[in-house]
């Protein structure tokens, strides 16, 4: 999906370049926070990935509760848990990621992609950023 088509579908908007987390991504991503952390404990943001962009393997740790929910909103992308096959993502799909599961997500090679990222509240939560998804791993997924 090209950028012009994507922008028509991406109802939550591109947001700003995701510079604070750029070191954990291959390619460019954008962040549009939808909730104000000063007003609620539930953080929701629209995350947009340019074609080929993906985040590093990472883990949302929690003693209890925690994890992340991805709600796919535009374009097409990938989600993969360690040791499992990648899942092709399209608008309307919801991925529930339990706490303490190593995973990554991002755009397909030839498509922009966005999802809402919902950080699930929990006890003693933290994020651990791990190694990048290699080009070899990513290229095996195809289009």
Regions found by a protein language model. Give the residues of each.
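A short, N-terminal "cap"/entry segment at the start of jelly-roll beta-barrel domains
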Residues: 1-43, 127-143
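Short, conserved beta-strand element in jelly-roll/cupin
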Residues: 46-50, 61-79, 118-121
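Short beta-strand His + acidic residue motifs that chelate non-heme Fe in jelly-roll/DSBH
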Residues: 56-58, 79-80, 97, 102-109
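Short acidic-glycine-tyrosine-enriched beta hairpin
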Residues: 83-99
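A short hydrophobic beta-strand segment most commonly corresponding to one strand
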Residues: 96, 110-129
